[in-house]
Amino acid sequence: MDFAFATAPGSERPNEDHVVVSAGQAIVLDGVTQLPGLDTGCVHNPAWLVRELGDCLARALAAGPTTSLQLILAAAIDELRTRHAGRCDLSNPHSPSSTVAIVRSRGEQVDYLVLCDSSVVYENADGVTVVRDDRTDTLPAYDRHTVGRLRNRPGGFWVASTDPAAAAEAVTGSVACSGLRRLLLCTDGISRLTEFFKLAWTDVFGIAERSGPHAVIDAVRRYETDQPDLLARVGRGPVKRHDDATLAVLRRRTADRHR
């Protein structure tokens, strides 16, 4: 199995999303945007982090094709620490970080992992399943002090940054290849189609199948422009008018579709 993908920045800023695809696997990352004036203790930015983490994950997946995805992620974060090359304070709670979504074909199974608010969505005979780590939805507050205090802590939320232990908190699972109809991985710049604009995931799959993954991003931009008033969360800070958006969509061979 292989994947088609698309990614686009939400503004003139560098794209802080990243996608890596190869035969039988896909990785989607969403770097956490740094607040202005926040001391991160790091000389690097989120765009650097997602590129390096993507490379670390690809290397770990190649080295351990049957290793659990949690261990793959832990190894990648551990390698990522060395790439800071001693120039950064890796104990800083605001160090650059990223969400993670991984899908890997393994024999007759497809394994998946999700950390923080990126998503894996698939459809089989049981219907559409959305795999998402929703712990950021229930924080007691969203100011920078509270978020920093609860990041990668029990009772808080978990991201890929400088602590390999975060990998053990990822949401993981497997689904049989047989009967798997459709699958995608995406950042929250794509899932806002369903969260805010109330499309069904079957609609998103349909756009991708008819016109390709870039058309899904085009749909996001149209909704962001035409219905910006829907971009709101109760009890949360303002939502970006335009966010970085990335997705990887499974392209199944004809023979696979008839298995």
Provide a role label for each language-model segment.
Residues 51-81, 203-225:
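Helix-loop-helix
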Residues 53, 62-123, 150-177, 239-242, ...:
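Catalytic core of PPM/PP2C metal-dependent serine/threonine phosphatase domains
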Residues 27, 114, 183-185:
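Residue-level marker for buried hydrophobic side chains located in beta-strands
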Residues 40, 125-127, 196-199:
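Short amphipathic alpha-helical segments
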Residues 121-133:
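A short alpha->loop->secondary-structure connector
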Residues 1-13, 76-84, 136-159:
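Short glycine- and acidic-rich boundary segments immediately preceding or forming the N-terminal edge
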Residues 1-57, 118, 165-174, 189, ...:
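N-terminal entry segment of metal-dependent catalytic domains or homologous docking segments
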